[in-house]
Amino acid sequence: MKKLVLLRHGESIWNQENRFTGWTDVDLTPKGLKEAEEAGRLLRENGFSFDIAYTSLLKRAIRTLWIALDEMDQMWTPIELNWRLNERHYGALQGLNKAETAKQYGDEQVLVWRRSYDIRPPSITINDERYPGFDLRYRNMSSGDIPLAESLKDTVARFLPYWNQSIAPQIKAEKKVIIAAHGNSLRALIKHLDNISDQDILNCNIPTGIPLVYELDDDLKPLNSYYLGDAGQIGEAISAVANQGKSGA
């Protein structure tokens, strides 16, 4: 049996402010820093160690991984960073408050933008200051790969090649792997692993800073999955994520 650990970054500044974040490079809040420490503690106390770690090019995920590994006394773990693990690009919604956007467009429309599979939010333009092509970290990307907005389907399409070519072979080679990433990039992977339908993925909500363990067979098919930590607190955290895009939240 092989194990894979997925970790959504700790609470970010824009999580706290209930804003659409996407590829905006915001940092962790004090609560997010503590969540990352707690994730590392849970992993250490449950006997986890890692041969390789993967994360995105966004500091909230990178810092979460650093802190968790530090708490485990495993800062020496090799880390690969790749844009394909970035959060879904929320286009013109990036920076907007989710509840205020729901008041303007309605809860149902915002839920579709946030949680549907194949519907993109409104796009930015290449002249928008939020366009990733202006950011040095993406200087080696082809212009065709740089998103103006993404659906979850788009996120799956750019995540899975990296999973298949880089991450999955490591797990099959008996390497112990952790992926520290984002709500939607992790949903993309979970959809693939658990073979979740396009409709049911709407209801998949991943809390910040809580390790999610997958037990996999030799073909990387899930045998079991579970969060580490207190079940009541995990349930509350999942509910909080589900309520972020509601006008009354």
Curated annotation (Swiss-Prot):
Enzyme class label: isomerase
Pathway: Carbohydrate degradation; glycolysis; pyruvate from D-glyceraldehyde 3-phosphate: step 3/5
A biological-process GO annotation: glycolytic process
Key word Isomerase present: yes
Keyword vocabulary terms for this entry: Gluconeogenesis, Glycolysis, Isomerase
GO molecular function: phosphoglycerate mutase activity
Record-listed E.C. numbers: 5.4.2.11
Top-level taxon: Bacteria
Residues binding substrate, per UniProt: 8-15, 21-22, 60, 87-90, 98, 114-115, 183-184
Site (Transition state stabilizer): 182
Active-site positions on this chain: 9, 87
SMART domains attached to this UniProt entry: PGAM
Keyword Glycosyltransferase: no
Pfam families, A to Z: His_Phos_1 (PF00300)
InterPro entries to which the protein is assigned, alphabetical: His_Pase_superF_clade-1, His_PPase_superfam, PG/BPGM_mutase_AS, Phosphogly_mut1
Reactions performed catalytically: (2R)-2-phosphoglycerate = (2R)-3-phosphoglycerate
Quaternary assembly: Homodimer.
Family the UniProt entry places it in: Belongs to the phosphoglycerate mutase family. BPG-dependent PGAM subfamily.
Task performed by this protein: Catalyzes the interconversion of 2-phosphoglycerate and 3-phosphoglycerate.
Protein name: 2,3-bisphosphoglycerate-dependent phosphoglycerate mutase 2
